[in-house]
Amino acid sequence: MSGLLTRWRQFGRRYFWPHLLLGMVAASLGLPALSNGHETAAPAKATASNHNPSKVNFSQLALLETNRRPSFTVDYWHQHAIRTVIRHLSFAMAPQALPVAEETSPLQAQHLALLDTLSALLTQDSTPPVVIRQAGYIPSSYSAFRVSAWISQVAGIRAGPQRLS
């Protein structure tokens, strides 16, 4: 009876809990993070009388995008679960003691690279990525594209008076 319990405990430690934790982390990565603990509802202005499915309102696209993808929030328990999964994976994929004369296989090299990446993720400071928005710069000598100017440059056809310079 004790052998069965020992095997069950080993199974739980090796397979069940890490996979359950990994599934919880994977499921929580797919869920949207709600900022400030409340859900923002989209304004419902469309009624049955003026709703036309073929008509698209482009002025509300930015609003829909912000409601669909709320701001990035760092949840302590979510981060803790991810770190625990990374720790489990790093211990599971730790290289075994190998003789020096043996050649390392490509699979082992991939495991070592993944292990280095996971350890870097564990030791890095956990700050969310910041989006840097840059305004587009338009040079002052820029002139708008005109079909007539393009035709005159490419085909040598000129329509209208010459430019006085």
From Swiss-Prot:
Highest taxon in the source lineage: Bacteria
Predominant location: cytoplasm
GO cellular component assignments: cytosol; periplasmic space
Name of a matching Pfam family: SecM
InterPro entries (alphabetical): SecM
Keywords from the UniProt entry: Cytoplasm, Periplasm, Signal
MF GO annotations: translation regulator activity
Signal peptide: 1-37
Subcellular location: Cytoplasm, Cytosol; Periplasm
Family to which the UniProt record says this protein belongs: Belongs to the SecM family.
HAMAP family: SecM
Function: Regulates secA expression by translational coupling of the secM secA operon. Translational pausing at a specific Pro residue 5 residues before the end of the protein may allow disruption of a mRNA repressor helix that normally suppresses secA translation initiation.
NCBIfam families, A to Z: PRK02943.1-1 (NF002799)
UniProt-recorded name of the protein: Secretion monitor
